[in-house]
Design a protein with these regions (language model features):
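Alpha-helical transmembrane segments of multi-pass inner-membrane proteins
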Residues: 56-74, 98-142, 147-156
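A membrane-periplasm/extracellular boundary helix in multi-pass inner-membrane enzymes
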Residues: 161-202, 381, 385
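Membrane-interfacial helix-loop-helix modules of multi-pass inner-membrane proteins that assemble, modify
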Residues: 63-100, 202-203, 386-426
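Transmembrane alpha-helices of multi-pass inner-membrane enzymes
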Residues: 283, 287, 298-340, 369, ...
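Membrane-interface alpha helices of multi-pass inner-membrane proteins
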Residues: 17-24, 128-142, 285-290
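TM-adjacent membrane-interface loops and short helices in multi-pass inner/ER membrane proteins
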Residues: 206, 210-240, 248, 254-257
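Transmembrane alpha-helical segments and their membrane-water interfaces
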Residues: 21-63, 270
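Hydrophobic transmembrane alpha-helices and their immediate junctions
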Residues: 254-287, 455-464
Length: 482
């Protein structure tokens, strides 16, 4: 802030917002407000395209690497066992993330970054590939809401290709998303016990996995405040609040929540008026996802719409005078070179050039790696008769619980016991179709990992051989100087 030039209006807003952040933190001790504030306030003179490009590399590499490594330690990662897909109790895997739903939200953000990077190049092929990825993530997460939100965003951004400018209907639909989310977050929970429409609200509550009831549990008088409260001192339940708007209200207070929501309404109006359709689709999908998860205003780093808010906040007319407190340092460090900043793009250009020249050979090595992965899975993986997991991680009833004297209890020989603590810990048996589903998941994961390793090996092999034959081929094809 001290090194960045601002107009008078922007400087006043900065001071007011930082003062508000200090008050919220003092009242709530919620460090997440700093992440929200600095993400928005740090967007002065920052290009969205550049931020999204860097985020795509960082987020993509980290997400893929974490999921791939976690596949080898599935039983030691976070999971849930719920009745889903008509298969009885089945596993929902997070693949290294904090919850299966978060796995799908991570994929939502990755898709948004890819779409923003592709811009007009996002066509049917890219839509089909990302939708296939959506199905793959759903195969492990079994998150209905996550799958639906990703599908809506992919379809909406593909729709833009044929209708780049929205009409009244599309504009109205986009601007209704946030009001509907607020209605279901702050109004419907109070009608669960209203006799006239309670049956209707209960049906909606059932369809959305009791999220309306959960919101009602937190909309109590002890959670109300103007500038936030230390929720850890008043929470009387271990229930998880899967709602960003209610989470923001009980942690940051009424006034900051109103200011944040007004900012989003203003951004929606601006994007609609300026026909920024791609940004509008991504924005409304994340706002919709915020009703199902608390990703918007916590420390999860998944709310990329904060970058939109920051860019919107610092819109200004050209030629307006700006002021900087440390202008001397600003001139001195006007241009900062980041070492190896272009290395990922250069490596990608190398890979693309090699793939175009040796496509057939690389595809053969990829197929061989996929087959080898399946063969290794067949040799190493042994299908158990069932699984015995802690009831804490399931939605099973208490009367279906079992207790094991030891982890190697002979009564459950052939079963795979997970997260065993002691003989007093209630456990749940998972068997039947869930076992077959896990076998399929292991084979699919082995095929994909084998194919990825095969593709990497094929590219490295051909890249090494190609460099020996032609030292300038990569430069000529990729279009940059070595």
């Amino acid at each position: 802030i001290l090194l960045t030039p601002y107009t008078k209006r922007q400087l006043v807003l900065q001071v007011l917002f930082l003062a508000l952040v200090a008050v919220i933190y003092y009242e709530s001790r919620q460090i997440a407000i700093f992440f929200v504030a600095f993400t928005v306030l740090g967007m002065k003179n920052i290009y969205l395209k550049k931020v999204f490009h860097i985020a795509l590399w960082v987020w993509g590499v980290c997400a893929v690497a974490l999921s791939a490594v976690s596949f080898f330690f599935l039983e030691h990662t976070v999971y849930r066992v719920h009745q889903k897909l008509g298969l009885g109790h089945i596993f929902r895997w997070s693949l290294g993330f904090t919850h299966p739903n978060i796995l799908h939200i991570t994929y939502l953000m990755l898709c948004a970054l890819i779409i923003w990077e592709l811009e007009e190049k996002y066509g049917f092929k890219e839509f089909a590939l990302l939708m296939a990825g959506n199905l793959l993530v759903f195969f492990y997460s079994v998150s209905y809401t996550g799958f639906g939100i990703v599908a809506v965003m992919l379809t909406g951004c593909f729709y833009i290709r044929f209708r780049p400018r929205f009409g009244i209907g599309e504009k109205l639909l986009a601007n209704l998303v946030l009001p509907v989310c607020l209605l279901m977050s702050f109004v419907l929970p109070f009608y669960l016990s209203w006799h006239d429409i309670s049956h209707f609200v209960e049906k909606i509550n059932f369809l959305v996995n009791t999220r309306i009831w959960l919101a009602e549990q937190f909309l109590k008088s002890e959670y109300r405040s103007l500038f936030g409260a230390d929720v850890s001192k008043v929470v009387k339940s271990s229930m998880t609040l899967d709602n960003s708007y209610v989470w923001c209200y009980i942690n940051y207070g009424l006034i900051p929540t109103i200011l944040i929501l007004l900012s989003y309404f203003a951004l929606l109006f601006y994007d609609t008026h300026k026909q920024r359709t791609r940004e509008l689709v991504i924005l409304v999908c994340f706002l919709g996802a915020g009703w199902t998860e608390q990703l918007l205003f916590n420390t999860s780093f998944k709310n990329i719409t904060l970058l939109f808010l920051g860019a919107f906040l610092f819109l200004q007319k050209e030629g307006k005078r700006e002021y900087c407190l440390l202008s001397g340092l600003t001139r001195r460090f006007e241009r900062i070179t980041v070492p190896l900043a272009g290395l990922p793009d250069q490596m990608l250009a190398h890979v693309r050039a090699v793939y175009r020249m040796r496509r057939g050979r690389i595809l053969c090595v990829t197929a061989a790696g996929a087959v080898l992965g399946c063969l290794l899975c067949a040799l190493v993986y042994q299908e158990p008769e069932g699984y015995v997991v802690q009831r804490f991680y399931t939605d099973g009833l208490e009367e279906t619980s079992v207790w094991l004297e030891t982890e190697d209890d002979p009564a459950y020989e052939g079963y795979r016991v997970m997260n065993y603590l002691d003989a007093q810990t209630p456990m749940q048996i998972v068997s039947g179709k869930a076992v077959k589903l896990e076998t399929a998941r292991y084979y699919v994961g082995s095929l994909l990992l084998g194919g990825m390793l095969g593709a990497a090996a094929g590219i490295l092999w051909n890249m090494t051989g190609w460099r020996k034959k032609s030292a300038v081929a990569v430069t000529e094809i990729s279009g940059y100087d070595k």
